[in-house]
Amino acid sequence: MGCDRNCGLITGAVIGAVLAVFGGILMPVGDLLIEKTIKREVVLEEGTIAFKNWVKTGTTVYRQFWIFDVQNPEEVAKNSSKIKVKQRGPYTYRVRYLAKENITQDPKDSTVSFVQPNGAIFEPSLSVGTENDNFTVLNLAVAAAPHIYTNSFVQGVLNSLIKKSKSSMFQTRSLKELLWGYKDPFLSLVPYPISTTVGVFYPYNNTVDGVYKVFNGKDNISKVAIIDTYKGKRNLSYWESYCDMINGTDAASFPPFVEKSQTLRFFSSDICRSIYAVFESEVNLKGIPVYRFVLPANAFASPLQNPDNHCFCTEKVISNNCTSYGVLDIGKCKEGKPVYISLPHFLHASPDVSEPIEGLNPNEDEHRTYLDVEPITGFTLQFAKRLQVNILVKPARKIEALKNLKRPYIVPILWLNETGTIGDEKAEMFRNQVTGKIKLLGLVEMVLLGVGVVMFVAFMISYCACRSKNGK
């Protein structure tokens, strides 16, 4: 009887030890299985989970616009007063709803090339008004004229055309005209062939972005989705030195197994440069743990604050010898037009940039850019891209509409908020196929290890107690 009891206790202890060992072994084996599965499914080729969602995003993406309506146009034009603006919006469009086109795999270098069609559909139910709402804004053509044509004689000729067309420093335009284009009366009088259509995003609809060529991850998963070339080049030809390089992905996804310590680099054709985001916090998105990466203030800092930005300073006058910060001159990318990009309401911009403008209220939560990245797969499941489009206007002696200005202004035209969040159905699928399985595997590992250890310890204690009792 004593032997049977002792044998049973030893058997229980052995079973517990086996369970504990199996649970311990399952941890690295399970991690290897997860890693192998993830590496297979994030490759950008036909048949993988990543490829299906990469070709056409399953996320509804909206682009909201807020227009800066100028309240005192005559006062500014006559007296060079501060520009008073009133933000109006949002006006919402659905974008990025078209699938990638001309998708071509190249097995020689493990890349896939494509173009991304552009399109925008107005969403009245998500907007405060219609596309026909009017705004008083800077006259884009008049403001750009002295930048593109610096010769004083040519400016004199342009001045006569501006007067003849009854154009001035400011104009009234509908939302649709301002965003997507209108025939400019001044440019229509220019006696040689030029484009007479002007718009902040003209041309956009029925155009494509690319060609992009990205690594598909087939031979090296750590390079998946990273851009190899854009429009056939590895450099942009807009900036000096390393600032001109095309770095990272397009921000829709990143190589898997993202760490908090990483700097996520991505290229944005909207701002004509590569940029980066850093880890801020952990976020629970519809039951999925994600890492929130944010665009740091340092990305738009002056070279004095961040020496790495020295090659983004392209001129010395407006930038106060490269000491101003928070704005980026992308004129070279826009055919010489004086376009400046910033965060909305000049968030993180130097006082000399925002001082001439009244009515701005920068807010970190509303105006910053962030990416919510699922760290195991590297997929961006939620994002908010926020940026502001500004036009530089400065005094021009030969152009009467601008001759009364006493200083240059970087005038905010509009700011946009492009957002996308994984849908409920996609989130459930993601939980079931990825995070749910990983949690279940982790739970099984811990249960086996925990139960095994408890059984082993309990049975061994009982066995020792029995032996001690029998010995007496």
UniProtKB/Swiss-Prot annotation:
It catalyses: butanoate(out) = butanoate(in); (9Z)-octadecenoate(out) = (9Z)-octadecenoate(in); (9Z,12Z)-octadecadienoate(out) = (9Z,12Z)-octadecadienoate(in); tetradecanoate(out) = tetradecanoate(in). A lipid is attached at residues 3, 7, 464, 466 (S-palmitoyl cysteine). Its main location: membrane. Pfam families: CD36. GO terms for biological process: amyloid fibril formation; amyloid-beta clearance by cellular catabolic process; apoptotic cell clearance; cell surface receptor signaling pathway; cell-cell adhesion via plasma-membrane adhesion molecules; cellular response to amyloid-beta; cellular response to bacterial lipopeptide; cellular response to diacyl bacterial lipopeptide. There is a cross-link at residues 469, 472 (Glycyl lysine isopeptide (Lys-Gly) (interchain with G-Cter in ubiquitin)). GO terms for cellular component: apical part of cell; apical plasma membrane; brush border membrane; caveola; cell periphery; cell surface; external side of plasma membrane; Golgi apparatus. The record marks 463 as: Critical for TLR4-TLR6 dimerization and signaling. The chain crosses the membrane at residues 8-29, 440-461. Residues 93-120 are annotated as: Required for interaction with thrombospondins, THBS1 and THBS2. Residues 30-439 are extracellular. Keywords: Cell adhesion, Cell membrane, Disulfide bond, Glycoprotein, Golgi apparatus, Isopeptide bond, Lipid transport, Lipoprotein, Membrane, Palmitate, Receptor, Transmembrane, Transmembrane helix, Transport, Ubl conjugation. It is a multi-pass membrane protein. GO terms for molecular function: amyloid-beta binding; cargo receptor activity; high-density lipoprotein particle binding; lipid binding; lipoprotein particle binding; lipoteichoic acid immune receptor activity; long-chain fatty acid transmembrane transporter activity; low-density lipoprotein particle binding. Expressed at high levels in heart, intestine, spleen, adipose tissue, skeletal muscle and, at lower levels, in testes. It comes from the Eukaryota. Palmitoylated by ZDHHC5. Palmitoylation is required for proper localization at the plasma membrane. InterPro entries: CD36/SCARB1/SNMP1, CD36_fam. Residues 460-472 are annotated as: Interaction with PTK2, PXN and LYN. Belongs to the CD36 family. Interacts with THBS1 and THBS2; the interactions mediate the THBS antiangiogenic activity. Upon interaction with a ligand, such as oxidized low-density lipoprotein (oxLDL) or amyloid-beta 42, rapidly forms a complex with TLR4 and TLR6; the complex is internalized and triggers an inflammatory signal. Through its C-terminus, interacts with PTK2, PXN and LYN, but not with SRC. LYN kinase activity is required for facilitating TLR4:TLR6 heterodimerization and signal initiation. Upon interaction with ligands such as diacylated lipopeptides, interacts with the TLR2:TLR6 heterodimer. Multifunctional glycoprotein that acts as a receptor for a broad range of ligands. Ligands can be of proteinaceous nature like thrombospondin, fibronectin, collagen or amyloid-beta as well as of lipidic nature such as oxidized low-density lipoprotein (oxLDL), anionic phospholipids, long-chain fatty acids and bacterial diacylated lipopeptides. They are generally multivalent and can therefore engage multiple receptors simultaneously, the resulting formation of CD36 clusters initiates signal transduction and internalization of receptor-ligand complexes. This is Platelet glycoprotein 4. It comes from Rattus norvegicus.
